[in-house]
Amino acid sequence: MHQPAIMQRALAVVALLAAAAAIAAAQGESPELLPFAVGAAPEGCDVGEGEWVFDEAARPWYAEEECPYIQPDLTCQAHGRPDAAYQRWRWQPRDCSLPSFNATGMLEMLRGKRMLFVGDSLLRGQYTSLLCLLHRGAPGGGGGSRSFETVDSLSIFRAKDYDATIEFYWAPMLAESNSDGAAVPDDRLIRGAPMNKHSSFWKGADVLVFNSYLWWMTGDKIQILRGADEDMSKDIVEMEAAEAYRLVLHQVTRWLEGNVDPKSARVFFVTASPSHAGAGGECYDQTTPVGAADAASYCGSTSRRMVQVAGEVLGASRVPVGVVNVTRMSELRRDAHTQVYREQRWAKPTAEQLAADPRSYADCTHWCLPGVPDAWNELLYWKLFFPARDEAI
């Protein structure tokens, strides 16, 4: 290995440890650390509460065109978005500051490890954001040192010089469902048990990050297939979405308790990403976040009931599940969705249709990259390396 590369990696780890030392100095004696942790977060720091600060000097972390991993439905600049200010907002927690994202340091901490994201297209956006952050902050050494492939439901990024993989597994409802394929069914049907099909891909992950919210929010009841019928059509009962969600999250926690060792692995749940798809496309033509004067009274569309269910079930897990709370911060960012500036995969309007009624074609659910998911990864980075003291083992 070349001497400059060794020095760069050493400095990256030193930077992480220096950040940990600064926090520890203010906190006194440190608790026993969780896997991957290098320090503990300051007491009373809720990184999910704060404000968006315009920071043209430090944001974005990377340019859209320089990241090879972004899907066409998230490349807003390439699809003609006329403004770019949505890329330049930095999340500032109310009572503390986030450490600077250190790409090389993160890869060093993941050396020889497997990090896996499991969930829906919103989590895939966060996964893609992380790959972009690592690509920009820790360029590969050439000679095929990085690779990326997608086979069916699994995407794998390999950082070969670190012997590390960062993966995404598509399971929008976590349990096996009729939403696992490319089609978007009108009704949601999930298998009540077991979780063998999906969870067989999850085993062995050293860092597991999962989410599930969007695909539950149809307004209709969820169909539950009981037993092991292969054609997904027999012995079906219906449940309210929140209770079906509870059922599946209980399955997930049981799987975690039987398959994850909290002394060597970490688990995180990313909270609901809000949609701003109100009547007439609430996000269309928005160019700034919800202002500070309106933020206190602004109430997003996120289902508080679903959030409550997730908190109750995951909070009772015997395997600690770190919560990455992105809901409130994202509710304030109605400006940062892909709107009409994306590849139109499903309903493909003509140019005339789009010009006549752009609001009806606006995607007010997914996020442009670079953008809001980068801030989610800053929170994940914080949680992974600087967990709260009450999360210590």
From Swiss-Prot:
Keywords: Disulfide bond, Glycoprotein, Golgi apparatus, Membrane, Signal-anchor, Transferase, Transmembrane, Transmembrane helix
Segments traversing the membrane: 10-26
Disulphides: 45-96, 67-132, 76-368, 283-364
Top EC category: transferase
Lumenal side: 27-393
Localisation per UniProt entry: Golgi apparatus membrane
Active-site residue numbers: 121, 363, 366
Domain of life: Eukaryota
Residues spanned by motif DXXH motif: 363-366
Tissues expressing the protein: Expressed in roots, leaves and stems.
Glycosylation site list: 102, 325
Function: Probable xylan acetyltransferase required for 2-O- and 3-O-monoacetylation of xylosyl residues in xylan. Possesses extremely low activity in vitro.
Family as reported in the entry's similarity comment: Belongs to the PC-esterase family. TBL subfamily.
Identification of the protein by name: Probable xylan O-acetyltransferase 11
Organism: Oryza sativa subsp. japonica
